[in-house]
Design a protein with these regions (language model features):
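Conserved C-terminal helix/tail region of periplasmic/extracytoplasmic solute-binding proteins
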Residues: 277-331
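Pocket-lining segment of extracytoplasmic ligand-binding domains
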Residues: 114-238
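Secondary-structure end/capping motifs
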Residues: 204-283
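Well-formed, non-transmembrane alpha-helical positions, independent of function
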Residues: 25, 61, 147-148, 166, ...
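Short linear loop/turn motifs
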Residues: 104-108, 249-257, 287-302
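Short, glycine-/small- and polar/acidic-enriched structural segments
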Residues: 1-120, 161, 323-331
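Short beta-strand->loop
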Residues: 33-42, 104-108, 173-191, 287
């Protein structure tokens, strides 16, 4: 199969895990899905980058200057990269007493068409291998404005905090003059996050046991990752846009890798949804709390607790204690 299901969820049996903006678009305008859980990197809101050789040190130095914004020519999928550029640029300007009226926004269309390239369609042992088919830390597919900035066609560009921007900065050609991750306000941490886990309503209704099994796996992997952050970083470095394993570790060391549907994280999802609707990136609004389906995460957590209870009590007692074998809530 090609890679469009990750963006338009056109497979009934797909459980999709990734950035926030594509599943918002799917739920709003394409088909009904269920939000199963999210994981949040709470301090990666985005940065503004300039050429190191230019006399630009503060955002106010960009008054009247050109800031680039990309535009995907791909009509099949959501233009998630542009959305986070748009949102991030607006927020950085606002935090510095400026608006879009103070700068020149220069649009850069690009093909964005790699999703069905022949090299992307070869068999894989694991779906997460898709990044391994690409030199993702060095190719510019997710840094589409870097060349324009280097050539001086624009004066500044958006990038994500810590991830991606570190790869740009490491060249020595560029410098970061504003970083949303430095602010305490969670509303500024909007770079296509929190990452969302979604499934179709078809799968949720016809095969809930598969959804629960998947969420059990996500909880177990998340717990392992929380307890073994360096080992997790070595694995994740193969797919992330940090510099290397140690940089990946620094990026994830304070991140809770177990998915949840906390009120704060749902509010962050609402932040992204509201922006997309207000700016016309989705046609239809929807209630994020109705989209959320916590029953699968709850059942998965309960089953894992029961399995652990059984394992522990079986080794200590002549027969398994039955305290968790009821559907009644405990506590």
């Amino acid at each position: 199969n090609d890679w469009y299901p990750h963006y338009i969820h056109n497979l009934d049996n797909l459980i999709r895990f990734g950035g926030l903006f594509p599943p918002i678009h799917v739920q709003a305008d394409i088909r009904r899905t269920r939000l199963l859980g999210v994981t949040h990197v709470p301090h990666e809101g985005g940065v503004l980058i300039v050429r190191a050789k230019d006399d630009l040190y503060r955002l106010s130095d960009l008054k009247g200057k050109k800031i680039g914004i990309s535009r995907s020519m791909n009509q099949i999928k959501n233009d998630w990269w542009r959305i986070q550029e748009h949102q991030g640029i607006e927020l950085m300007l606002r935090m510095n007493g400026m608006t879009m009226e103070d700068i020149q926004l220069v649009e850069f269309p690009y093909a964005d068409d790699w999703y069905n390239f022949p090299e992307m369609l070869t068999p894989m042992e694991n779906p997460s291998e898709w990044q391994l088919k690409r030199d993702h830390k060095h190719e510019l597919a997710f840094r589409p404005l870097e060349t324009a900035l280097e050539k001086g066609v624009i004066d500044a560009m958006y990038s994500q905090s810590k991830v991606l921007s570190v790869l740009t900065e490491a060249t020595g050609k560029f410098a970061i003059i504003e970083d949303l991750s430095k602010y305490p306000d969670w509303r500024l941490q909007v770079a296509n996050i929190p990452a969302a886990i979604t499934c179709t309503d078809v799968m949720a209704e016809e095969h809930p046991e598969l959804v629960v099994a998947f969420m059990k796996g996500m909880i177990k992997v998340g717990r392992w990752s929380n307890e073994h952050k360096h080992a997790a970083a070595a694995i994740l470095n193969k797919q992330t846009y940090y510099l290397d394993v140690e940089d990946t570790y620094r990026g994830i060391k304070d991140v809770d890798m177990v998915p949840n549907l906390s009120l704060l994280n749902l509010a962050a999802v609402e932040q992204g949804t509201n922006f997309m609707f207000k700016k016309g990136y989705i046609k239809n609004d929807f209630d994020v709390h109705q989209w959320a389906a916590p029953e699968f995460l709850e059942k998965a957590s309960r089953e894992l607790l029961e399995e652990e209870w059984k394992r522990v009590t079986t080794s200590k007692l002549p027969q398994t204690a039955a305290a968790l074998e009821t559907d009644r809530r405990i506590g």
